[in-house]
């Protein structure tokens, strides 16, 4: 049984930035190109709606997350960019320096999403030698994050006015530091990076449902991300994670706090009937051939969380993909990743989110189609209701 893990935690909400295009339909060509102007509009709408950050995706047709993150942070004041690092595809020290730069220039708003990869095709295109080695990718990620942490926390940093070359940087090293030497990364000296505004460093977000993913998250993540699933499934995921966290605590004596995050879609309308009609409309233009092609692609994944999405879709296909009250898996016919849609009135959507929060979820990354209009609608109608309900329930518990 999962106790309420959010008794003293604030709930954070983020939105998704559609850097591969946007529109009113899923599984067909985008109606809106991911221009700089449009992405800034979505980011500003999310900020105005009361959403604290934006997840900037990576892979395939997505525009580079770091370039987009740099652009949108210069056009917003409080919105935080959650950008992706890809262990093995860039060096950990370079990623740490990029993260420090983004954190400095944004005034301490940088957030880091650790992506080991779920699409074998994408990993092959990127030349990842571990494209077909799921557990080894997480083993590598563990070392990668350790190096990033060392770069951020075990030096005094390199201030812009002090850049005098490698020898000058070396004089700032702590004599007690030891160079990192692991299976995937070896260094002959301790590594350095510019100073970060956030201490000890920008937060890590990491997802994955496999035991290896949970182990890395227990050790390094500030937020462990899960893709949307029925509430009972999420309860089991959290219970499994707590077992891994307990084992890590027994082995190391370290008890790290980790928050739980949920990635899902939302669709809010005035009536439940309107909402369900709008949900089916999202996939109304998809051809049977496109669905078949998507299913074949999803079946090739070695990612446990995508396999769970596939299983959920198949298990509930005779129920028209309704996997729980106001929960719909229909988008997963053609959309990979966190495709579960929370669909209904503002009251119903906020109530389903409350139920996830009562399980221990304290970070929500949401999206809807089109992302601009749905950010505005969610922020105006459902988000205030959530905050009202959550505050009321916390008062009752107090």
Predicted regions and their residues:
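N-terminal beta1-alpha1-beta2 module of alpha/beta enzyme domains
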Residues: 1-78, 135, 161, 167-171, ...
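An alpha-helical appendage that flanks or caps ligand/catalytic pockets
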Residues: 2-19, 120, 126-127, 133-198, ...
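Active-site mouth loops of central-metabolism enzymes
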Residues: 19-37, 86-93, 131, 198-209, ...
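Alpha-helix-loop-beta-strand connector modules within alpha/beta enzyme cores
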Residues: 65-83, 140, 144, 247, ...
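Glycine-rich, proline-tolerant flexible connector loops at the mouths of alpha/beta enzymes
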Residues: 53-72, 228-233, 366-379
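Conserved, mostly hydrophobic/aromatic
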Residues: 13, 46, 50, 72, ...
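Hydrophobic faces of well-ordered beta-strands that scaffold small-molecule active sites
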Residues: 11-15, 54-56, 80-85, 110-114, ...
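Acidic (Asp/Glu)-rich catalytic clusters
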Residues: 5-8, 44-48, 70-78, 99, ...
């Amino acid at each position: 049984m999962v106790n309420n893990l959010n008794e003293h935690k604030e709930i954070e909400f983020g939105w998704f930035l559609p850097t591969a295009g946007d529109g009113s339909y899923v599984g067909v060509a985008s109606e809106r190109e991911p221009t700089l102007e449009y992405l800034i509009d979505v980011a500003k709408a999310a900020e105005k709606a009361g959403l604290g950050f934006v997840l900037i995706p990576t892979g395939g047709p997505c525009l580079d997350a770091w370039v987009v993150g740099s652009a949108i942070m210069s056009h917003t004041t409080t919105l935080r960019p959650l950008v992706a690092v890809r262990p093995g595809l860039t060096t950990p020290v370079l990623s740490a320096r990029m993260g420090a730069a983004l954190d400095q220039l944004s005034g301490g708003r940088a957030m880091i999403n650790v992506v080991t990869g779920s699409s074998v095709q994408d990993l092959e295109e990127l030349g990842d030698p571990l494209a077909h080695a799921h557990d080894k990718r997480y083993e590598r990620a563990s070392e990668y994050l350790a190096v990033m942490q060392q770069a951020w926390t075990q030096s005094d940093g390199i201030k812009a006015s002090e850049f005098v070359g490698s020898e000058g940087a070396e004089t700032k090293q702590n004599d007690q530091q030891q160079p990192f030497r692991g299976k995937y990364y070896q260094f002959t000296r301790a590594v350095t990076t510019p100073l970060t505004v956030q201490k000890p460093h920008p937060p890590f977000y990491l997802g994955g449902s496999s035991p290896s993913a949970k182990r890395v998250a227990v050790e390094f993540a500030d937020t462990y991300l899960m893709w949307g699933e029925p509430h009972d499934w999420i309860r089991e995921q959290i219970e499994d994670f707590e077992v891994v966290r307990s084992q890590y605590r027994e082995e190391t004596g370290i008890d790290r706090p980790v928050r739980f995050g949920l990635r899902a879609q939302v669709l809010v309308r005035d009536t439940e009937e309107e909402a369900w009609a709008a949900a089916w409309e999202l996939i109304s233009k998809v051809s049977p051939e496109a669905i078949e092609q998507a299913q074949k692609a999803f079946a090739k994944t070695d990612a446990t969380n995508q396999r769970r999405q596939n299983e959920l879709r198949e298990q509930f296909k005779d129920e028209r993909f309704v996997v729980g009250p106001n929960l719909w898996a229909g988008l997963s016919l053609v959309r990979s990743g966190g495709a579960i849609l929370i669909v209904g009135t503002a009251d119903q959507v906020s109530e389903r989110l409350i139920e996830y929060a009562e399980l221990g979820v304290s970070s929500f990354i949401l999206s809807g189609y089109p992302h601009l209009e749905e950010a505005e609608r969610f922020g105006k109608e459902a988000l205030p209701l959530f905050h009202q309900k959550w505050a009321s329930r916390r008062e009752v518990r107090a």
